[in-house]
Every structure is written in C-alpha cells, then in structure tokens.
Design a protein with these regions (language model features):
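C-terminal catalytic "cap/lid" subdomain
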Residues: 1-136, 140-187
C-alpha cells in the first residue's frame, strides 16, 4: 500500500523477484485522445507531427498505442486540450474520452515470462479496456479504463494476482502459465 508503506503486512522494495507481480497502481483523471487518419498509412513523420503538437502545448503523454491509420494516447493535463484537438484535426478525425484511469501492474514482466501478461489481461475479462501499453518496460503493463470501472478492475487484479483464495482457476482455468504466475505472485 503506497499510501501506508509502514502499515502491517505492507512490503515495498525495489528488489526484482523473478516471475512475481509486485504491485498494482492507478492514476485518475486521465483523458484519452484518438487520432484516425488514412493519411497516416505509410506516411513518414506522422507521429512526429502529433507529438510536436503536444510539445507545443507543454502536455506530456502518459501512454501511446499506434496502428496503421491511427494513434491513441493518454494525457493527465487538460489545460490546453481544446487547442490540441484543433491542431490534431488538421491530420484526421479526433475522439476525446475523459474520466479515464490508468491501471498499472508492476513486476517481473520480461517477455520470456510466458503467460504473465495473458494472466493479467484475463483477470480483466469483464472490464472494457480502452488501451493497453506493454513492452516499453520489462516491469509494467498499463491499461486505460473508465474511472467508473477502476474499483472493479483493481479488485479483479488484486484477487487474481494476490489473493490466497486464488488458485489461478478463475478467469483463466485452461492456462497452465496463468496458474503458475498467479501462484508465484503470492510469494
């Protein structure tokens, strides 16, 4: 518990324990911005132009995902959102979703730990996920969900990753690697 690091039962350290999920964190008041543009397909410099708009308005980007014709990202500063959206509209259709939340699972998530990310994602099987960010770090996977789904998402992750009642069978009974990951997370 980062709000009570000295509380009984709480252990916070930076030691890497192989195959173990260490914590779950959440960040509220996030805004998702999605830009869809057929001009992005095979276009050089499109992302640079998008990022320059955010830089111009001194607005940091928390998460980003891309596809052939679109980019989705999240920000936690809406001060210049109107101006940013107007600039982005020059490049395509812009959709803004407010009242979002980033949920981050932290631990040993190296790509060779097969099944860990699927175990985490399976725990959220009833939660609408807007965006997933994974691969930029070996230590976390982040999900963008609606703030109204935050409590349910945190409870599901906590139960499936840390609860002594969890035998790895709830949302992912057929995955041996999920069972293994869930059980190891309780160390």
């Amino acid at each position: 518990n980062t709000m009570a690091p000295t509380a009984k039962g709480t252990i916070i350290d930076n030691e890497l324990i192989p195959h173990v999920i260490k914590s779950i964190a959440a960040k509220d008041d996030i805004t998702a911005v999605k830009i869809v543009s057929s001009r992005m397909l095979l276009a050089t410099g499109f992302l640079r132009k998008v990022f320059e708009i955010f830089e111009t308005f001194n607005t940091s980007i928390d998460m980003v995902t891309t596809s052939e014709v679109g980019v989705s990202l999240s920000i936690d500063n809406k001060m210049h959102l109107t101006q940013i959206v107007e600039e982005l509209k020059k490049y395509g259709t812009v959709v803004v979703e407010e009242n979002m939340c980033i949920i981050c699972v932290v631990g040993d998530l190296r790509w060779m730990n097969v099944g860990c990310e699927s175990c985490i994602t399976a725990a959220l099987h009833d939660i609408p996920i807007r965006m997933i960010s994974f691969g930029g770090s070996d230590h976390n996977i982040s999900f963008l969900v609606r703030e109204v789904d935050k409590k349910e998402a945190l409870q599901a992750l906590s139960y499936h990753l840390f609860s002594p009642k969890c035998d790895g069978s709830k949302a992912f009974e057929k995955s041996k690697s999920c069972k293994r990951s869930c059980l190891k997370s309780k160390l």
